[in-house]
């Protein structure tokens, strides 16, 4: 994570490259949607690092636990400079007693550290993770 690349465009590209590389040898297909009109928008190093580590943990969980064959990554920046990264899989979801793993706790802490929010939606049709932060 080179600090000279601290903008949304480079961050999104880095996350997508990581996801595709990490899941390359699996049956999991990566689909990406970018809803960002200003990819040059600056992103602090701390925010970039924490968001990336949340994405990495999410993808690791999908690989290890989901039994998914697709993952959808959506990036959105609204007019109020609120950035959302959504990672969704079409796997089996998880039992509520599995909702307290260290990885999930770490994602919550990382988002708190940058003044953001983390939300997880779970169903038998997969898991949806939302990471939201004001830039």
Each PLM stretch: what is its role?
Residues 75-77, 120, 131:
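Conserved catalytic core of two-component histidine kinases
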Residues 1-10:
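Flexible helix-coil linker/loop segments in the cytosolic histidine kinase module
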Residues 70-81:
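Short beta-strand/loop element within the Bergerat-fold HATPase_c
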Residues 96-125:
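ATP phosphate-binding glycine-rich loop and adjacent ATP-lid/helix-beta elements
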Residues 82, 93, 123-130:
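Glycine-rich nucleotide-binding loop
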Residues 48-71:
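Conserved ATP-binding N-box helix of the HATPase_c
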Residues 89:
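Acidic ATP/Mg2+-coordinating residue in the GHKL
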Residues 10-47:
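Helix-loop-beta hinge of the Bergerat
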């Amino acid at each position: 994570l080179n600090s000279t690349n601290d903008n949304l465009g480079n961050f999104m590209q880095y996350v997508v490259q990581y996801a595709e590389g990490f899941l390359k040898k699996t049956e999991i297909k990566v689909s990406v949607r970018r809803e960002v009109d200003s990819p040059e928008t600056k992103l602090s190093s701390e925010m970039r690092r924490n968001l990336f580590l949340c994405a990495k943990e999410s993808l690791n969980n999908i690989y290890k636990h989901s039994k998914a064959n697709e993952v959808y990554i959506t990036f959105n920046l609204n007019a109020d400079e609120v950035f959302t990264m959504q990672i969704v899989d079409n796997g089996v979801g998880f039992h509520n007693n599995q909702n307290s793993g260290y990885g999930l706790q770490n994602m919550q802490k990382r988002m708190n550290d940058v003044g953001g929010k983390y939300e997880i939606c779970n169903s038998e049709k997969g898991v949806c993770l939302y990471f939201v932060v004001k830039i």
